[in-house]
Amino acid sequence: MADALADAAPLLTFPSGDAFCAARLFLPSLASRNLPCVVLANGFSGTMDWIVPDFAARFADAGIAALVFDYRHLGQSPGEPRQLVDVRRQREDLRAAIAFCRRHPALDPGRIALWGTSLGGSHVVEVAAADSGIAAVVCNMPALDALRGANVQAKLARAGMGRAPLARTSLRLLAAALWDAVRGAYDAAPRYLAVYGDPGRAFFTDPALAERFRAAEAGAPTWRNRVAARFLLQAPRYRAGTLGRMAAPVLFTLADDDVEVSAAFIRDVAAESPRSEVREYPGGHFDLYHGARFEEVAADQAAFLRRVLLAEGRPT
C-alpha cells in the first residue's frame, strides 16, 4: 500500500497550528490547472493509508483532485503524545488543509469540497457550516453526535448485552478516560485504549469486525490499534441548526444496518437543510468501505461531486 500511495500521490506537507500535517494530493490523469478538489477527513483513529486512498483514487478518476492527510498525532504527521484524537485540533487540521488547497496553483479555490467519514463527518459539517466558500460536502456515515447519534439499541442487540453489562463496560472506559486526562495534564504518558478489542478495553468490540481490523493492520502500515482514552471526554456533539447554516449542498451516504451511527438521527439532521440528499445502502458501518458496496458508494459520491463541481459552464 505504501509504495502504491507514493506512486499515485507523492508525500507533501502543509502547516497546521504548531506543526504540520503530512498529506498526499491525488490528481486526475489529465491534470490541468484550475481543478476542483475534495479534501478527505478520515474517521476515528484513521490515517491516510487506510480507507481514504480508495475514495481519493475514485474521485481523481472522475476528474476531481483529492487531498488526503494525517491529523497531527497520527500516522506520518508529528505531534506528541502519539495517537491522540483531539476534536478541536483535528478540525484545525482540516481548516489548514482547506487553506493549503486554496493556495495550490493547480487547484481552483472556488471549487473546494469536503468529504468526511465517521468522526470525520462531524468535522466536515462543523467546518463547512462556518465557511461559506466550501462548494460541496459529502458525509459518509457521519458520527455527528456521540450520544443522540449513537445507535445504542442496535449495538446492544448485536452484542447480546443487557444494560447492566453495558453500564459496567462504559464505567471502565470512562475511568480510563479520566485517568488519561489527569495524566495529560501532567504531561505523563497516555492511558491508551485499543481501537478494536475486548469490551471495557476498546472502542469497537464487535467480533464480526476482527477481520476488518486485522486487514487494517496489515494494509495500513502507519495505523495503530490504540488511541489515548481522553477522547471519550470530548466526543462530538451536534448543535441543532448547524446543517441549516451550511451554504453548500451535502450528500449523506448511510448504512442501513449501522450499529455505530443512527441513520434515523442523521435523516433528522439532514432535514434541516433543503440542499441535503440522503442515500442508504445495505450493510453495516464498515461495509461501505469494502468490496461491491464500496464501489457503489464511491460511484454515487463521485457523481454528486461531479454534478456540483463540474457543472456545465464552470471552468475545468
Task: State where each predicted segment sits.
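Conserved alpha/beta-hydrolase "acid-adjacent" motif
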Residues: 259-265
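Short beta-strand/loop motif that positions the catalytic acidic residue
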Residues: 246-247, 252-254
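Alpha/beta-hydrolase active-site loop
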Residues: 84-104
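Catalytic histidine-centered segment of alpha/beta-hydrolase-like enzymes
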Residues: 284-298
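Alpha/beta-hydrolase-fold enzymes
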Residues: 126-212
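N-terminal cap/lid segment of alpha/beta-hydrolase-fold proteins
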Residues: 1-32
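The serine-hydrolase catalytic nucleophile loop
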Residues: 44-57, 71
